[in-house]
UniProtKB/Swiss-Prot annotation:
Name of protein: Glutamate racemase
InterPro entries: Asp/Glu/hydantoin_racemase, Asp/Glu_race, Asp/Glu_racemase_AS_1, Asp/Glu_racemase_AS_2, Glu_race
Organism field: Brucella suis (strain ATCC 23445 / NCTC 10510)
GO MF terms held by the record: glutamate racemase activity
Pfam families: Asp_Glu_race (PF01177)
Disulfide partners: none
Domain of life: Bacteria
Amino acid sequence: MKKAPAGSFPAKPTIAPERPILVFDSGIGGLTVLREARVVMPDRRFVYIADDAGFPYGNWEEEALKRRIIELFGEFIANYDPEIAVIACNTASTLVLEDLRRAYPSVPFVGMVPAIKPAAERTSSGLVSVLATPGTVKRAYTRDLIQSFASRCHVRLVGADGLAAIAEAHIRGESFDEALVMAQIAPCFIEKDGKRTDIVVLACTHYPFLVNVLRRLAPWPVDWLDPAEAIARRMKSLLPARSDDDEFHSQDDLAFFTSRKPDYAIRRLMQGFGLRF
């Protein structure tokens, strides 16, 4: 297979460790999924991979991005032999999930898709907004979800072209202009026939890191729906059960960045999540 564009990877250990769960995102938003996965699977080993060399994915031409992710996973699978792989990125999941399953049939893949079905089940007003990247908004897959599960609701798709980058800045402790955040989320709030939007689906794993900011800036209270917990439960359901006699993993959880150059703030963040480089 052609060498992945992100550079060389660590050599595969000579003594095979416990097969990890691989959590992949374009940046650090997938940590929201990792956090929930550890709650439901504290005995499992994780490898977190951020394709920061390719971030943000919204700037990519679709076929080029698809090729990149498929090639990267060839390296990831060869080096880490994951028990399961989680695409903790809505943009990547809606673009390439099925291609990954075809390319690597021996690895179970779990993807992130907008939580439109639970939003439709939970809404009282029937007014639901989906806050996502422009790539997720324009995919036919997203519209198919609406047609299948939310046809009786008024669903507004809101493509936020800069919110993931703002979330990354926020996680790093950097300042940002809250007016930009307000401009990104304002289209989510609809008033119609005396009713208001009551659920906003967070259809990007970066956005939950901003949820306290979003709550404060919102013109009225809504349910900010984060699918990370449901994805973690789905991951667990695909793995073989462990008995009480099974030993917990002894290997460290790892973080790998495709740029090979995470800055100091990111390294501190990863260490705070108990991830070793």
